[in-house]
Amino acid sequence: MKIAVVGTGYVGLVSGTCFAETGNDVICVDIDQTKVDRLSNGQITIFEPGLEVLFKRNLKEGRLKFTNSLEEAIDGCAVIFLALPTPPGEDGSADLRYVLGVADHLGKIMTDYKVIVDKSTVPVGTADRVRDAVAANYKGDFDVVSNPEFLREGVAVDDFMKPDRVVIGAESQRAFDVMDELYAPYVRQGNPVMHMDTRSAELTKYAANSFLATKISFMNEIARLCELLGADVDMVRKGVGSDDRIGKRFLFPGIGYGGSCFPKDVQALVHSAASVDYDFKILKAVEEVNAEQKKALLPKIMQHYGNIEGKIVALWGLAFKPNTDDIREAPALEMIEALTELGAKVRAYDPEAMANVKAIMGDKATFCDSSYHTLEGADFLVIATEWPEFRTPDFSKIQLLMKDKVIFDGRNLFELDTVKKHGFTYYSIGRSDIK
């Protein structure tokens, strides 16, 4: 099948590459000619484990192409995926200017039946607005489908190739048939393909992400309570997660969630509810808890030191989660801002995200070439992202490099007995302090 993918950001590039991997002819569109040239020359523009191998293979074999011409991309294609940004406005609503702008353009250049697919995360009713925008200029047959993505950064290729489920929202059997054919190679093991109306599909994505964000904020509140009551959040987490009605995932406490999805989608669902005069109280609390949790280590730091002016801080992790270079809404960025405002000097390391942080924060931090390099002369260590390479460090080496053996762990990477054995002062989330 010939497919056009409009947008070469995270969702567009992963989707386009993975569709090409099963034999489809995919042409991706982006208005940025420099980006198109880089991609056409085999230079991948995002970090995602496993993606580059598929990207280069399909580019070489001619199944994956790039252009800045929408007309060229849709010529002869059966399906057009819209994988465009929907950034939050000042009021939290999703900005649909890019989605609706492309829909308007499609209406002016389409000449035959197409299935237009919203792959972006969009508010309920967007499919109707896309349909109206296309129909304003094109009077032929077409369908608009909502097909939300459920990709987790860091494992997105596996998520796409072996999805838990495929949600397809459409209003015609013809559209369902086209989408079923396209997704058939990915659901051979019986993963469910769920047919529903477009509005239900649109809400499904927001509801899923908002529920996961709710689990995180709930567990972070439990962690705060553990600190006040003398309980251990790791033990509580295991006890709660063993109930299969709840499950073990998304119950790890920390310094809050970030990324391109959870913050934006929770905001957008709150705004969508408000637009129909519904006050989504739970999600407002989820946002409030997360905003507070991003600063959860600061009171511990200030309680320990009193004043950190002139202190050198080693910071491990900048990306919002491991196995990605995505720094959108990353807790580490707020940590850098807060620490530097209090007069500290930050020495940071991340395996993938340093260039992205440097581009927006400049010289607010010193960027080091290894985790151990950050520790040279540091007064204390802050851990903001749970990269695998941080989990089993050489504690003896850390002791030699640091001025003071103090760790503030925002991701609970280390066992309490381990840091105690090595003589560290250790603060984590929802557990006893080691002093």
What are these regions (language model features)?
Residues M1-K435:
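Structural/interface elements that position substrates and couple domains in central-metabolism enzymes
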